[in-house]
Structures are given as structure tokens and as C-alpha cells.
Amino acid sequence: MDSWTSPDVPALPFTAEGPRVHDTARGAITPLTPRPGQEAGLYVCGITPYDATHLGHAATYLTFDLVNRALRAAGHPVRFVQNVTDVDEPLLERAERDGVHWEELASREIQLFRDDMAALRIIAPDAYVGAVEGIPSDVAAIRAMLESGRAYRVPAEDAAADAGESPADVYLDLAQVPTFGEVSHWTPTQMMEVFADRGGDPDRAGKRDRLDPLLWRAHREGEPHWEGGSLGAGRPGWHIECTTIARDHLGTPFLVQGGGDDLVFPHHEMSAAQTRALTDDAFAEHYVHQAMVGLDGEKMSKSKGNLVLVSRLRAAGEDPAAIRLALLSQHYRTAWEWTDAHLEAARQRLDRWRHAAQTATASPSTADAEDAPAGDAVARQLAERIADDLDAPGALAVVDRWADAVLGEQTGAAAAAARAEARGVRTAVDALLGIDLG
């Protein structure tokens, strides 16, 4: 599947410190250090394309864009993979509601997502993979788990006639995965509280454990389906899709599994369990999660409809750089509520930064300093903030102080020093924050 066009990312004039982030599975701030000689594998769960990109989505993809940029700034080559869940229940239900074919709806929303990501200057994935593309790998993985005894069949009495002679859904047997719970560290009671609301089927008759995740759904009338060989006609479950896409395009364990914190359980927990069932290996070395963005007292959600859409803000004439700055003003691990005041503050900040960059570049004292190396103290401070658990608000404050020094009352050596930093600040703001100061 085609991705979008990546922004140009300038190289810093120094090698930044490697990023440290909060690892959900470890419950601690942990350095992201690729294994010697290996790329930094980054997998970020993508959209289910039944509606447009809202600011909760954008915040997540921006957080992992910071991870990507921080790893690159530290000298690590990055291989970034993202999936698209281009067949799933929410997509099918929305297509039926709207009277359009599910493939048409998915295609339209995927293109809108690409446009939003390009406008926000998110570095594009090296592999952008639809779930449908990965079905052959899903089938092979599910068959392997059945053969090893780590998956089992549950008869599907309501299956379509073409689902096979003995149609069945297939489930992972979590009792065969002793590491289950290694990502979330939740209790079974905590898991059960959200399992049904997050795509699980705890009341499915015939399951060995109510939390066992669906691997293969036998074909039902009116649902899209694919040939699964000995599995019969059907389609894969949600979690196995990411498991196989990540394994095929990154290998396991890769460095970082990322997503919103509503994916900690069941999605990332199940992806890890399925990988253990397949290979006995870890799925990822680190799990990093973005907190929810709310609106009107609830998390922003396509199912609830309380959305601020990136595409609508762009259509209204908002500068995507201001949208990006508004999201960067909040730390990724802090849940927060969007208001118009965030965007207004971001507009003002962007204008001030660009004015400072223009003023510093045009200043006679800057011209006098052209023979001297450009200063990089501010750029280094900015890089330090991003390396410290993606402290974007702290990074913005660093640039704010520089802009104040350029545009304020200071004269003499202090003002000249701030103006001499202009080139380094422009480069670092672009490379690390993804903001072009013009």
C-alpha cells in the first residue's frame, strides 16, 4: 500500500543523546537503544479507516514521529512500519450504515489520512501495510498455532455454506502462554472490564477462557471473506494482523511498539501473546503509549462522534504547523482536553518563532557573526528535552526563551548570542519538532 511523501528532515550539526521513554511493560523510563548493527524497528498501530483523522489520532502519530526523529538524531537508522486495519467490524458497520461498499469507504478515508499526515509533516512509514495484504501470513501463523496445540477451533454453527465442511472460528489458548499479562500487568478482572468494549467476545460459547482472542472468523453471510485453506473461508482477527505484519516487516523482537494507551489491552497484550505462541520470542523490546485527548469531558472517539478533525481544521485555513504545535504543547503521557485556546496559543507561538527567526537572520549583528561558527547551545537544549521522555512542552519552552531573547529588550552580547543561534534553532526545530520556520 502506498504511504505519503515524507518531509525533508535536516541533519543536526551534532549527534543527539538517545531518547529515554516510559516503557509501559517495564513501568519505568527506559533508554531506547537498538541492538548493535541493527536498525531501530518502530511499529505504530494505524487507523481503522471508517472516519477521518481526529486530533486524538494525530497526537498519537505525532508522538511516534518524535520517537522516530529522536532516534535518527541520535544516529540510529530507523525502519518504521505502520498498518491499516482495512477490514474490521467498525469499518463494515459504518459502510453498511452509509450505504457504501466497505472497500470504497476504506480507500477514501485512507487517502484522507495520508493527506493529513503529509500536512502535519509526519515522517512516512517505510512499509505501510493493509491488513488485507497480510492475510496469507495470518493464515500461515494461525495454522502453525493450531498444529502446535496453542490454538483451538470452536464450531461456527451460523457460518456461511462456503466456510468449509466443519466451519469453525479459531482462538488462541492463553493457557498455553504463561507470559500473558507481560505488557499491561493487569489482573484478569481488570481485563474483563474492558474486553468486550474493545473488540473481545467474552461470552462466545465454546471458548476455553473468556479472554482467549479470536484468530480466525469463519465466513458469515454478508461479510467479506478470504480462502484460508484448512481454516476454511473467513477472515483474520484484529490482533493477529499486527502480529504478522510486524514480524514480516521488522522481525521480532523489534525496538518499539507504539500506539494510544487504549491499545495496551487487549491489542498489544494479545499481539505479544500471539508472538510467544508462534516463536516463544518477545514481540517488542519496548511498549510506549500516548494518553488520550478528550473533548467535552470524554476521550475523542470516532464511535462517540466527539471529534475535532484535522482535515476540517485544514479546510478552515489553519496552518498545519500550528495544529502540530498545539499537540506538542502537551506531554504524551498526560491525558488532556482539547479547546480552541490550545490552537490560538499555538498560532501565536508559531508567529513569534517565525518572526524571531526572520529577525535574527536579517540582523546586522548576525551578518557580523557569519564568519564564526553558528551557535548550537539552544539546539542542544532542545535535543536534551526531546531525549528526556519526549518532553515536547519543555522543548517548546526552550525555543520560546530564544525567541524572547531575539525579540526582547536585550542588547549587546546577550542579544547577539541569541541571534547567532538562529541557524541552529531553525535546523533543530525542523529536525526534532517537525516545524518549518520558513
Swiss-Prot record:
EC number: 6.3.1.13
The keyword NADP is annotated on this UniProt entry: no
GO cellular component: cytosol
Motif ('ERGGDP' region): 197-202
Binding, Zn(2+): 45, 242, 267
Cofactor(s) named in the record: Zn(2+)
Any one Gene Ontology BP term: cysteinyl-tRNA aminoacylation
Binding-site residues for L-cysteinyl-5'-AMP, renumbered to this chain: 45-48, 60, 83-85, 238, 260-262, 293
Listed InterPro entries: Cys-tRNA/MSH_ligase, Mycothiol_ligase_MshC, Rossmann-like_a/b/a_fold, tRNA-synt_1_cat_dom
Region (Disordered): 1-27
Motif window: 'KMSKS' region: 299-303
Gene3D superfamilies: Anticodon-binding domain of a subclass of class I aminoacyl-tRNA synthetases, HUPs
GO molecular function, one term: cysteine-glucosaminylinositol ligase activity
Catalytic activity annotation: 1D-myo-inositol 2-amino-2-deoxy-alpha-D-glucopyranoside + L-cysteine + ATP = 1D-myo-inositol 2-(L-cysteinylamino)-2-deoxy-alpha-D-glucopyranoside + AMP + diphosphate + H(+)
Spans through the membrane: none
Motif 'HIGH' region: chain residues: 47-57
Database matches in SUPFAM superfamilies: Nucleotidylyl transferase (SSF52374)
A Pfam cross-reference name: tRNA-synt_1e
Keyword Metal-binding in record: yes
Free-text comment on the cofactor: Binds 1 zinc ion per subunit.
Family to which the UniProt record says this protein belongs: Belongs to the class-I aminoacyl-tRNA synthetase family. MshC subfamily.
Role played: Catalyzes the ATP-dependent condensation of GlcN-Ins and L-cysteine to form L-Cys-GlcN-Ins.
Subunit and partners: Monomer.
PANTHER family: CYSTEINE--TRNA LIGASE, CYTOPLASMIC, CYSTEINYL-TRNA SYNTHETASE
Protein name, as recorded: L-cysteine:1D-myo-inositol 2-amino-2-deoxy-alpha-D-glucopyranoside ligase
Organism: Kytococcus sedentarius (strain ATCC 14392 / DSM 20547 / JCM 11482 / CCUG 33030 / NBRC 15357 / NCTC 11040 / CCM 314 / 541) (Micrococcus sedentarius)
Gene from which the chain derives: mshC
